[in-house]
Every structure is written in structure tokens, then in C-alpha cells.
Amino acid sequence: AVTHQEIAFEIAVALRKYIKDKGGKCKVFMSPVDVQLDKDDKTMVQPDVFLVCDQSKNTGRCIYGAPDMVIEVTSPSTRKKDFGKKLGKYVDAGVREYWIVDVKNQKVIVYDLGEDFGENMDLMIYGMDGEVPVGIYDGECKIDFEEIVNSVVNI
């Protein structure tokens, strides 16, 4: 849906601006870019927004290996997968941070998975009425969801 795409785009723009301003090495990608999570060729996903800091993972055809951060914007058809199956896949693959933007409930669920495949996973829940800190940048980068919500119609 349009709202889903608008929210994903605004998040990607905010991340890109932060990275560019800081001269960072990570790159922001958006669906429909394929991400091959493991070596068996069977686990191909297309996250809504994701960050890759190791550019050797970019084969030109797909991203090969776990992104550093993944953001999924839920829609009625993806909601169950975003909270269930995908979380498990991202933890197993070594994603460091996973956000679920739950538009219906106006929440941003942040899983800080760390670098130990979720062994010491932290979970935080934010409202979509303020800033949400990006953990892989130690909270220095913040996504202003109030601004995003105000710029997106039909939310």
C-alpha cells in the first residue's frame, strides 16, 4: 500500500541523511532488493529497509549475508510473518538490530540482537509519536516518527 511505502521511504531517507552527514560506510537499501540470509540459497528475503555496513556483501545481484539492521513496516498481510518467522530468520542470520513498525498499533518494536545471534536480546517498544534511537549507532541517530507520521497521509 502507499502508506507502507511512504513510511519505509521516509525511514530510509532519515538513515541515509545521518550516514551521509557522518561520512559513514553503511548503505541503505529498500525492497525489492534480495537478501540471501544463508548459504543454502533457500532463505531469500526482501526487507522493507535495511542497512549493510560491509559492502563486500553486495554482489550486485543481491546482498549475500545478514544486513546490520532490518526494518519491516507491517501491513495486514505481512504482520504475522514480521513478528514470527522473519524475527527467527534474522536472529539466526546474525542481524544486529530489527525494527518492526506496527502502523496499526502506532508502535515501533525494536529488537537489539547484538552481535551474539540474539543471546542477549533486548526488546524496546516506542510510540510513533517521537524519536526512536538507532542502536547500531549507539542512539546518536534517531528516527523522528512524529515527523514521518505527520508527513504521511492516511495513517
What feature does the model see in each segment?
Residues 5, 9, 13-18, 27, ...:
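C-terminal interaction segment
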Residues 1-2:
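N-terminal, charged amphipathic alpha-helical interaction modules
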